[in-house]
């Protein structure tokens, strides 16, 4: 077909005639009977087919030709539209996230430490004041007074109003002691608990909390600690979490600003004294609660019996948090800062404790060990010297009690302690200076150092029971007589017997 027939309705007619011709020329493709078809019937069929094609052409207005010609173009347009839609959705998502983080980290006067849309949080002072007014209306007198007392404390001592950074002395203590540098210190004025062994806390009948002496460090990526509940009655509420200093310790953690806690009821509190938020399963006796802190992102999370729960606090990077445990009734809680293995496997493997188990400070030497210790060696030598001196003094006292060395009343020549001389000494007048070789000096020195060999004297000196006859001065000296001065003379046996018999006869003769 050429000319106007290619683009007009004639094209369809031509196509129809071609189709009709092909049908007529191929009669074998259609099952027919052996009887010949009349020519009038074939013309009627051709007219019917032409009529149907013309009606379709009129209804679709040339749609057959247009569809076959534009099929490839419409496919490309569909792909382009899909790609542009995907890129547009991504751009919209990026813009929304940018706006969210911009308002989250740059807006002042807004506390947004948790995710948006979570109930139980306050993000500005007006909303908190509205919640406070609603809560005070339904509080009882005791709860209202406790809240007002805590509010007055927070106003007088705002959070982070005192220096809580780790000082140089505290850092050195951590280096020396390791994780043993952390311990719980109860407030003496309001303490209703007792701390034993630095980390074992026993609470009594009233509400109170206890903080550690040191904050959580910020050098590592993650710090983690755990608390195990012992002896918890059903009506006792236990809260484990983190707080800043100063904090009203007569209240549980999580009730006031810059504090968070996981309560034994299964709720959590974050800067919220009025309403708590469901968080996890309730806690009972034997459960272990873990608290993790990521200083770089300011995130705080909890674990229960070794299973991590969702994050609670975000962007708390500037505060110094102290591990805190509180209760309103009798219970016992043991805390593990890393001195033992954690129940949370990840923290146990990655060593997320507050400090190493052992510091650089060496332990004291064990008693009874001989590891070349100077202290133990000197003590052993001192004991030997003391025993030898006691033995020498005992021997000298025994010898000095039996052997009497007559001192000289006149001074002699100067000689060494080992020089023994028994020669007669010249008489020197008493008004002259006796000098170093005087008998007085020798007498004083003689009390400490014997001048004679006691081993030779033991064979020559009589036994201690021997007594010299009366009137004999042998073996006696002034030094030996001095101890007996002031005591009456000892009478002999005969004199004592005679006096006794005389007294008896005299008493018998008297009426």
From Swiss-Prot:
Keyword Transmembrane included in the entry's annotation: yes
Presence of keyword Nucleus: no
Localization in the cell: Vacuole membrane; Endosome membrane
Predominant location category: membrane
Membrane topology: Single-pass type II membrane protein
GO CC annotation: endosome membrane; vacuolar membrane
Matches recorded under CDD domains: SPRY_SSH4_like (cd12910)
Pfam families tied to this protein: SPRY
Parts of the chain that traverse the membrane: 83-103
Region annotation (Disordered) ranges: 432-511
Residue positions the entry lists as glycosylated: 400, 499
Listed Polar residues bias regions: 437-455
Stored PROSITE patterns: B302_SPRY (PS50188)
GO biological process, one term: protein transport
Similarity field: Belongs to the SSH4 family.
Role according to the record: Components of the endosome-vacuole trafficking pathway that regulates nutrient transport. May be involved in processes which determine whether plasma membrane proteins are degraded or routed to the plasma membrane.
Designated name of the protein: Protein ssh4
Lineage: Eukaryota, Fungi, Dikarya, Ascomycota, Pezizomycotina
